[in-house]
Amino acid sequence: MKKRSGEYAERGDYHANLRQDWPYLPVYLEKMKLARQLLDATDPNGVIFDMGCGEGILVDEYRRAGYNITGMDLNYASPSILQKNFLESGLEDSSVDLILCLDVLEHMPFPEQELAVAEFARVLSPQGRAFISVPNLAHFASRLSFFFRGELIRTSSIERHPGDRPIAEYMRIFNKHFIIRSRRGLFPTYPMISLLTVLAPSSVIGLHRLYNRFLAPPNLCFLNVFMLEKRLA
């Protein structure tokens, strides 16, 4: 049986029923593609947790494929998802092989973000990895807006993303506990692609892939995706 609270009580399982006019659609699809590529190359017998997984799209998909993957979310519960705060995960030290945390940290207040990253490092095995995506407050369009209007373009409302911050600040937090092995930018917010994404998101998915491949310096992108390895003492 599923239990929903927060935005899932209000909006339903919106990641499972994607709206074609959702402006975030092209970025979401690219992010999920990268996550699936990682999981496909991961040992299914390893211990995997998707922290802040929402409806558990990846959790349910890969459990059906035989993976040892569990979700954890404050606002969702199902047979494969534990409804709890992952800051109080209850997991043993060095007990997890892979953590996914996709577009979650920005929903947390600043002090809790570093606590979350430290908790990931605590529960990961010595060879453990964390796959984390976070939006970048200092993306290209946001910088233009600040230059001309004195105002940054937030990645969502301040109520929804209280922890919105420039990507360099996230990286400083990651570097305290992890080694950044890879970093990739999605959706460089140049004027043309930004306008088209707002007007017709489902029609520019291919254009996003092209931009992401050739024209996406991470510092200018809306979303950054990181592969982190646990920093050993």
Where are these regions (language model features)?
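Conserved N-terminal segment of class I S-adenosyl-L-methionine
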Residues: 1-94, 98-100, 114-117, 186, ...
